[in-house]
């Protein structure tokens, strides 16, 4: 039997984040009948490094887990990685991938299994620049504090786009007021592209206020993955969008492959609910954990041997082929271009299979070697 430790976060933006992620893991492990014990603990927003380290120490030293799943992307994760290195135990980092890699990566015992948001935002910026050359950037004080904002806007400008206006909202719905943005768009009708990054209730509020404007029908919204969250209408209320909204995402329920159909069937069977992004991420994580269990005779749960054994392995993920980039120990999957209709239902209109090329562009961009921003994991605030 494999013993899995999972340190899970809290999120006010996405209250069910940890729950959905855990249910996705459990749904896959149960479906595949993987003999595994899952031990969980909660680390809040992950902004207290001592607390997170203490929970990791308990799992690695006292409970002696074979693999530690850690939902976090703070720089302080390095302290846990150092502990795991001394024990030669694998840390499987999971998060949205909204930040650029740290300068201590790659780490010899860390595998980063993210949703690759910086890759998708970079691709969306390029896509937007190919259609419209003048844009307004729309984000919140919170969402704009992560690298995915730079990935979206910089790639737009690098491909000939001009940013004519920046709208940065407060991060509470009660204080959300997009009137300055609407006034700008009415006075500058040549600006029809909106590079937009919001999540949760702010995403819904942004779309709801925008759809009520007379100018809305002339606009095109190029969205971050969390703004294209399919669950927004069900959670926060119906939308009737008169404008086109599109962008690259890590996953959408309409992906037509066998692995995604299996995810949707088994998640519904296990939970009684439709599959969602966090649930898919948990399912995907368990896919990797199953491989680690099945190859245990070769590596005996030694982290460095596990990582060496992943070289050249392709997983059949609901997202498409999932592989490790050996140079950085980051898992990479295709990016899906979607266009949403008036009620935010999504249609896949394109895909980029070779996201390793975009990932390498990010790594090669020397202007982003040092980045500032929020210390907590994206969505975990």
Briefly describe each language-model feature range.
Residues 1-20, 29-33, 133-139:
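Short beta-strand segments enriched in small/hydrophobic residues
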Residues 20-21, 31, 35-99:
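Beta-alpha junction/loop-to-helix N-cap segments that form part of ligand/metal-binding clefts
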Residues 31-47, 108-109, 157-178, 193:
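Short beta-strand elements in bilobed, periplasmic/extracellular small-molecule ligand-binding domains
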Residues 61-73, 92-94, 136-139, 189-206, ...:
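Periplasmic-binding protein-like
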Residues 67-161, 220, 230-236:
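Extracytoplasmic ligand/sensor domains, especially the bilobed periplasmic-binding protein
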Residues 210-283, 296-297:
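Extracellular/periplasmic periplasmic-binding protein-like sensory domains
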Residues 294-309:
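Short, charged, surface-exposed loops that flank catalytic or proteolytic processing sites
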Residues 318-381:
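Solvent-exposed, acidic/polar segments of extracytosolic/periplasmic ligand-binding ectodomains
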């Amino acid at each position: 039997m494999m013993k899995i430790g999972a340190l899970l976060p809290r999120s006010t933006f996405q209250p069910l984040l940890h729950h959905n992620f855990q249910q996705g893991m459990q749904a896959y492990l149960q479906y595949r009948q993987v003999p595994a014990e899952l031990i969980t603990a909660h680390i809040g927003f992950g902004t207290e490094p001592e607390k997170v380290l203490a929970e990791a120490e308990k799992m690695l030293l006292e409970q002696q887990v074979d693999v530690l799943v850690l939902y976090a992307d703070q720089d302080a994760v390095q302290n846990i990685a150092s502990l795991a290195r001394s024990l030669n135990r694998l840390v499987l980092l999971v998060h949205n991938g909204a930040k650029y890699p740290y300068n201590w990566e790659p780490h010899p015992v860390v595998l980063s299994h993210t949703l690759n948001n910086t890759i998708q935002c970079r691709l969306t910026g390029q896509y937007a620049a190919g259609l419209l050359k003048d844009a307004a950037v729309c984000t919140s004080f919170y969402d704009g504090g992560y690298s995915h904002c730079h990935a979206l806007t910089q790639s737009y400008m690098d491909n000939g786009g001009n940013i004519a206006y920046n709208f940065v909202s407060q991060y509470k719905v009660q204080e959300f007021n997009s009137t300055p943005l609407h006034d700008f768009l009415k006075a500058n009708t040549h600006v029809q592209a909106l590079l937009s990054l919001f999540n949760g209730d702010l995403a819904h509020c942004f779309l709801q206020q925008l759809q009520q404007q007379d100018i809305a029908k002339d606009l095109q919204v190029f969205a971050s993955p969390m703004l294209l969250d399919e669950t927004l209408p069900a959670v926060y209320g119906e939308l009737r969008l008169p404008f086109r909204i599109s962008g690259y995402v890590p996953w959408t329920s309409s992906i037509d492959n066998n692995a995604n159909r299996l995810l949707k069937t088994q998640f519904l069977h296990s939970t009684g609910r439709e599959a969602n992004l966090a649930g898919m991420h948990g399912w995907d994580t368990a896919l990797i954990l199953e491989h680690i269990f099945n190859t245990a005779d070769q590596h005996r749960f030694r982290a460095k041997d596990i990582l060496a054994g992943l070289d050249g392995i392709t997983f059949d993920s609901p997202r498409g082929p999932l592989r490790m980039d050996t140079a950085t120990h980051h898992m990479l999957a295709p990016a899906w271009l979607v266009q949403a209709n008036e009620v935010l239902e999504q249609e896949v209109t394109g895909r980029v299979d070779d996201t390793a090329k975009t990932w390498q562009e990010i790594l090669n961009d020397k202007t982003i070697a040092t980045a500032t921003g929020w210390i907590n994991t994206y969505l975990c605030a």
